[in-house]
Design a protein with these regions (language model features):
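Cytosolic covalent-transfer regions centered on His/Cys nucleophiles
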Residues: 1-140
Length: 140
């Protein structure tokens, strides 16, 4: 799983003012490295407005994404953990995983491995504790 979620793409904060701010913060490492554009971030936010919190896959975990290829310069992921939960359209979130896919299929192997981590309740609880080094070690 090494390389899918490098240390520089993992952030831990105390709290975010709202879910949109959390998505912006979660996306910053990818935007800074020009792996995605602002359009991709805007599209993720618009998707939640249009379709509701469907990106919330399990308690406290949102897999943020938008249409593959649009605003994506390179396949990449980033992670934001908020120690205080953030409300996303009625769903409490502490973990925001941003997935930027270049196309419909090339990201599936990486996504599968990362999702195994987040679907493990014990590991997800450990991630929510917010110790960055522990989180980095889980993914690298």
């Amino acid at each position: 799983m090494e390389g899918y979620l490098p240390k520089k793409h993992i952030k831990v904060i105390e709290q975010a003012s709202d879910w949109k701010s959390a998505v912006l913060l979660a996306s910053q490492p990818l935007l800074k490295e020009k792996l995605i554009t602002q359009e991709y971030i805007d599209n993720m936010i618009a998707s939640v407005h249009e379709h509701g919190p469907y990106m919330v896959l399990t308690d406290y975990f949102a897999l943020m994404h938008a249409k593959a290829g649009v605003g994506v310069n390179e396949q990449s992921m980033s992670l934001l953990v908020t120690k205080s939960q953030v409300d996303m359209e009625g769903k409490p979130i502490k973990i925001f995983l941003v997935l930027a896919a270049k196309d419909a299929t090339s990201h599936l192997a990486a996504l599968s491995q990362v999702m195994e981590v987040f679907m493990d309740d014990d590991v997800r609880e450990t991630i929510m504790l917010g110790d960055k080094e522990t989180i980095v070690n889980i993914f690298n």
